[in-house]
Amino acid sequence: MMPTLAPPSVLSAPQRRCQILLTLFQPGLTATMATFSELNGVDDDIASLDISETGREILRYHQLTLTTGYDGSYRVEGTVLNQRLCLFHWLRRGFRLCPSFITSQFTPALKSELKRRGIARNFYDDTNLQALVNLCSRRLQKRFESRDIHFLCLYLQYCLLQHHAGITPQFNPLQRRWAESCLEFQVAQEIGRHWQRRALQPVPPDEPLFMALLFSMLRVPDPLRDAHQRDRQLRQSIKRLVNHFRELGNVRFYDEQGLCDQLYTHLAQALNRSLFAIGIDNTLPEEFARLYPRLVRTTRAALAGFESEYGVHLSDEESGLVAVIFGAWLMQENDLHEKQIILLTGNDSEREAQIEQQLRELTLLPLNIKHMSVKAFLQTGAPRGAALIIAPYTMPLPLFSPPLIYTDLTLTTHQQEQIRKMLESA
């Protein structure tokens, strides 16, 4: 069979993948390679790459699998909860990347399926749904942007369709307690009662839990205004986290409240992700851990009590982002961004790498280490702004130079103390 040929697609790769994913969630449609090729205006080779990348993304971020049936059709497999959270993410992304697809294809398909199932129109009428969202807005004292209102109306229709089909997410005990403790749970129960009165049938107990999670994920944490009991508890937990980090690292922060506020905004969302197995970008940790090993280890140790309190284990990606926040605030306390350490290089890259790693282990603070060949250093001297020269090779000393420390392989205790003192001085 000859592959389908098509002119270059006008859509970007993220747009194509978003349309693929939303098509897979579109009710009443069997999607094959040909479906995606035609949808995105690409040939089969590009469509295949897009499908593979979409599969990798939903596996990484939502623990879902993209499978192929005997007829060549694709489907998303995994728990109902993970599938709903996946659609939450991609549908919101779709309103930015491919709004015309949502308007012209996803929405009509959803409404058509609701009608086909015989669900009363007043359940999914746009006016009624907007009134329900506005009621939630007033109860939560949160103003939804027009895009969020549009998203919620559409997403609630998808949940209604699943509810009617007897498909409901399952929560483990920890997830259940978390959802029940959030500000949005009372509003979610109200939505459940609304559906129950109109449908004259009981609402599964986990459905209001999901509605609470849905609305809580739309809320941007605000350390100055959030006043719910769980928000106050989180602020206290973060204070203990910062105290623990300060003790472990023997450091101080000039604006500890500012640090706590930033950690609150981040960790409020990180807890949601960790409790519900939502992944984040995994490109940071390996390189970051190599550059700032002591900062990463200290952050992980400081987080142990926080994780125990909430019954979670933050992934390396999540703890790496917390380390970035701590590192940024440590740099504000110091003048490290103005300093440079010059590591002289020659013909022994392994020795140089070991010495650089020792330097990075000396301090929590991010280091600005630049490499410069011995030959260039002897010819031109130290670069402007260099605060310290580390020389792994014997050589003639220049007449003028910043402080220079020679080490064969292992920094002595005295050298470590001197370097640390120099680096951590303001």
Curated annotation (Swiss-Prot):
Record Gene3D superfamilies: PRD domain
A GO BP annotation: regulation of DNA-templated transcription
Domain PRD: 120-225, 229-336
InterPro entries xref list: BglG_antiterminators, PRD, PRD_sf
UniProt cross-references to Pfam families, sorted A to Z: PRD (PF00874)
Keywords: Repeat
Protein name: Stationary phase-inducible protein CsiE
Organism: Escherichia coli (strain K12)
